[in-house]
UniProtKB/Swiss-Prot annotation:
Residues 40-62 form a coiled coil. It comes from Serratia proteamaculans (strain 568). Residues 1-3 are cytoplasmic. It is a single-pass type II membrane protein. The chain crosses the membrane at residues 4-21. This is Cell division protein FtsB. GO terms for cellular component: cell division site; cell septum; plasma membrane.
Amino acid sequence: MGKLTLLLLALLGWLQYSLWLGKNGVHDYVRVNDDVAVQQGSNAKLKARNDQLFAEIDDLNGGQEAIEERARNELSMIKPGETFYRLVPDQSRRNAASSSQNNLQK
């Protein structure tokens, strides 16, 4: 009876060692779960970026509005009959700001 108990205890010890410290044990499971969580976050960011790019492609393929918006913003184009206005900061405010900075530096 004593030999059987020792054999079962040794088997139990070996199984516990395999479970906690062996290959594919709890430590590996936790590490892999952390890696999966990091990768899922990265995948979510990339999926959002891809969705945005696909939406932009759909706009460019199907709509004039996206083409007009891009021409206005990137090429500074205007439609016939439109008036282009450029808003510039007030010169007196800019001079006052620069003179106050000069006074602070002295």
